[in-house]
């Protein structure tokens, strides 16, 4: 059994991680930390996990965490940096669900996250944990920077076109919408039920901190085809709990051929990417609580603009599920181990 440690397991990504690992046949959570909830039973804070965990939150301890085979950080941005150097020096394998090690340019990270980076020396060695791109690197990685939710949906949507150099990268557009859990568990007025329900709005249109991560990832995917890449990214708030829907737009360079076949062939062997039949369009409810990304692609009226629609669950493929997918790869397991259940409908 893989001994799993979780640092900061009281938020939405933490409980999602616990939910997934509760049914994982080759993993066992042996330690979960929280300074605020130390001594409290996991099942007391999360009653849905009663009968699945006989485990209490504890104060973070480097010595205890180093006894684990893998450590997940489900902490707010900026927290993992404080412990990471000691854990890596101690030989730990770490999967960080926060943004601390995603962006390679330190000055860019500090600008968008509004704080000094506490562990810049490890950023270059972190592997960006998007399995559809970096599977081989993930296998031997010691530190995984798990992608953000919007970046996952957008990169998977554009990926086949970028790899083949079929689109004009100078004016990409991503129009994305997320459920309220994308903002985390901390209370805020915009996320109150009476504020978010029965409404739909854009936010962060002048600049969202996922933008540099997305552009970095798209450039990595496109390589020589991504020179001069620029993305206009506008996120929106959905009146739902979970889910992300991204609608992506790009100008085709010329006759791109059969776009449906391109996507189907690229993702044919990806266990967590489902290319829908031509004419079908993805719905967020079809991926709820799953690690699946569902995609459709179309060139409306054949006017030279390609439109891609990509949906994920922001807490699963957009965070904790993708983290477990990375863990499975790191330990040579089937990628879908512990995550084969379909979405709940209705």
Curated annotation (Swiss-Prot):
It catalyses: N-acetyl-L-glutamate 5-semialdehyde + phosphate + NADP(+) = N-acetyl-L-glutamyl 5-phosphate + NADPH + H(+). The active site is at 149. GO terms for biological process: L-arginine biosynthetic process. One of its GO terms (molecular function) is NAD binding. Its main location: cytoplasm. Keywords: Amino-acid biosynthesis, Arginine biosynthesis, Cytoplasm, NADP, Oxidoreductase. One of its GO terms (cellular component) is cytoplasm. Pathway: Amino-acid biosynthesis; L-arginine biosynthesis; N(2)-acetyl-L-ornithine from L-glutamate: step 3/4. It holds the Pfam family Semialdhyde_dhC_1. It is found in: Cytoplasm. InterPro entries: AGPR_AS (IPR023013), AGPR_type-1 (IPR000706), NAD(P)-bd_dom_sf (IPR036291), NAGSA_dehydrogenase (IPR050085), Semialdehyde_DH_NAD-bd (IPR000534). Its EC number is 1.2.1.38. HAMAP family: ArgC_type1. Catalyzes the NADPH-dependent reduction of N-acetyl-5-glutamyl phosphate to yield N-acetyl-L-glutamate 5-semialdehyde. Belongs to the NAGSA dehydrogenase family. Type 1 subfamily. This is N-acetyl-gamma-glutamyl-phosphate reductase. The lineage of its organism: Bacteria, Pseudomonadati, Pseudomonadota, Gammaproteobacteria, Cellvibrionales.
């Amino acid at each position: 059994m893989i001994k799993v440690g979780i640092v900061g397991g009281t938020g939405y990504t933490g409980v999602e991680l616990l939910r997934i690992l509760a049914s994982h046949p080759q993993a066992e959570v042996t330690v979960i930390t929280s300074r605020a909830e130390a001594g409290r039973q996991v099942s007391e804070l999360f009653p849905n996990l009663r009968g699945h965990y006989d485990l209490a939150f504890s104060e973070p301890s480097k010595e205890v965490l180093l006894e684990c085979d893998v450590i997940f950080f489900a902490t707010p941005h900026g927290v993992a940096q404080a412990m990471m150097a000691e854990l890596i020096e101690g030989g730990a394998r770490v999967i960080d669900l926060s943004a601390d090690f995603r962006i390679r340019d330190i000055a860019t990270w500090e600008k968008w996250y509004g704080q000094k980076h506490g562990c810049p020396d490890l950023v270059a060695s972190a592997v960006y944990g998007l399995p559809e791109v970096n599977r081989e690197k993930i296998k031997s990685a010691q530190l995984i920077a798990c992608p953000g939710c919007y970046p996952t949906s957008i990169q998977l949507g554009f990926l086949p076109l970028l790899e083949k150099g079929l689109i004009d990268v100078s004016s990409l557009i991503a129009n994305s919408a997320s459920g309220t859990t994308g903002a985390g568990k901390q209370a805020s007025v915009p996320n109150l039920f009476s504020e978010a329900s029965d409404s739909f709005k854009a936010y962060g249109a002048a600049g969202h901190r996922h933008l540099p991560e997305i552009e970095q990832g798209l450039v990595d995917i496109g390589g020589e085809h991504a020179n001069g890449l620029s993305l206009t990214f506008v996120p929106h708030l959905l009146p739902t709990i979970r889910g992300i829907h991204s609608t992506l737009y790009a100008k085709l360079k010329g006759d791109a051929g059969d776009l449906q076949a391109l996507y189907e062939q690229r993702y044919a062997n990806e266990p967590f990417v489902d290319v829908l039949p031509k004419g079908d369009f993805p719905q967020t409810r079809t991926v709820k609580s799953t690690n699946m990304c569902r995609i459709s692609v179309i060139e409306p009226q054949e006017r030279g603009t390609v439109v891609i629609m990509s949906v994920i669950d922001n807490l699963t493929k957009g965070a904790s599920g993708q983290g477990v997918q990375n863990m499975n790869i790191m330990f040579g397991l089937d990628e879908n181990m512990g995550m084969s259940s379909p979405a709940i409908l209705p």
